[in-house]
A protein has these predicted regions:
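ABC ATPase "signature
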Residues: 222-223, 231
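Conserved ABC ATPase "signature" C-loop
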Residues: 216-217
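Helix-to-loop junction immediately C-terminal to a conserved catalytic motif
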Residues: 53
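Conserved ABC ATPase "signature" region
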Residues: 113-132, 185
Length: 249
């Protein structure tokens, strides 16, 4: 039995102009783990996520999801099994919160009663009142509320894997900290396999069981927060750790 929930096997992604977004990536994570993916703009973080949900294909190598090569899985069906939270929440502005959250269950053919039960449960799970929120539109909510709805939508069909692309990056510090607390509470309860992209080292250390550090399309280090703080593997990681300590101090 394959022990990995997600694997990237010797993957490179080259664009038509010859530049590489990712080079020789060998990476894996186990079921129920939260992996924080950190790097500067242009480091390959977004390409990494897009490979996982088959929005793009690798130039070489293979992406393996739950033991099966992604290239052998129908991309539409695959994405419906992967929860996804984009940076801006990605809610449809002219749909109600109910319509947004119930989208994937509806596409999967769930009975309406089951969809509504799931809606109530998930909104409550992310600390929103279903009776007050369900019929409202995204523009009527605060930024923090919209991100909570985006998380609820990503979990709607109970996917085993959830991808989060800078989910808290556009929020004020107080709301960001509150949603980080909510994320930790949800993960302790649900034990999903989570890939969280961030540019914030403190957020990566707080939310990730392990951390993958990218620079210019190459993995610099993968390890627990303690492993990275205690033994930076490259000069770049050492610099990040120095900045982290300076910011905290």
């Amino acid at each position: 039995m394959n022990p990995w929930a997600l694997e990237i096997q010797q993957v490179s992604k080259q664009f038509p102009d010859g530049t590489y977004a990712l080079q020789n990536i060998e990476w894996s994570m186990t079921e129920g783990e939260t992996m924080a993916l950190i790097g500067e703009s242009g480091s390959g973080k977004t390409t990494f996520l897009r490979l996982l949900n088959r929005l793009i294909e690798p130039t070489t190598g293979a992406v393996v999801i739950q033991g099966k090569p992604a290239c052998l899985q129908d991309p539409i069906q695959l994405r419906r099994r992967l929860g996804y939270v984009p940076q801006d929440g990605g809610l449809f502005p002219h749909w109600t919160i109910k319509q947004n959250v119930c989208l994937v269950p509806h596409l999967l053919g769930w009975p309406l009663e089951q969809q509504l039960e799931r809606l109530d449960r998930l909104l409550s799970l992310v600390n929103l009142n279903p009776s007050q929120i369900a019929e409202r539109y995204p523009i009527e909510l605060s930024g923090g509320q919209r991100q909570r709805v985006a998380v609820a939508r990503a979990l709607a069909a109970d996917p085993p894997i959830v991808l989060l692309d800078e989910p808290f990056g556009a929020l004020d510090p107080l709301t960001r900290h509150d949603l980080q607390d909510q994320f930790l509470s949800l993960q302790a309860r649900l034990q999903k396999t989570m890939v969280l992209v961030t540019h914030d080292m403190s957020e990566a250390f707080r939310l990730g069981n392990r951390i993958t550090i990218l620079k210019e399309g190459c993995i610099q280090q993968v390890g627990t927060p303690h492993q990275i703080l205690d033994a930076p593997a490259t000069p770049y990681v050492h610099l990040l750790v120095q900045h982290f300590h300076a910011h905290r101090g």
